[in-house]
Amino acid sequence: MSVQLDAYLFFPGNTEQAIGFYQQVFGGQVTITRRRDVDPTATPEQRNQVINALLTGGDITLRASDREDTSISPQTRVELSLIGTDDARLRAVFDGLAGGGAVLAKLERQFWGDIFGSVIDKYGIGWQVNIGTAGA
């Protein structure tokens, strides 16, 4: 049996906008479940909260939700790493993620032989992009 890792991201009330941004970058389909869809006891303030957003297809699977926890900050999140050999696709993804964000390291050839760069997107999520050579 194979193992698959899906990233699950938490946002302070703007999950729908964030997952829409990632859909523009990666492609795929989005499914959103709001608290009102599954919790009949939700207060009026909670009804529109995204309790699960799922982006599937395209290059990746991402899951996300709104979280009321105010301790969430870019410093408490992880960086996501994209690794592959499709140079054109990974460069386009890098540029898409950089839109409205900040490039920390330009895509450049590194001492280990691959092209690597990193960016923090406009939602504060860090991304590492590593473009390897085919067959490596």
Region spans (language model):
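Core segments of cupin and vicinal oxygen chelate
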Residues: L9-D59
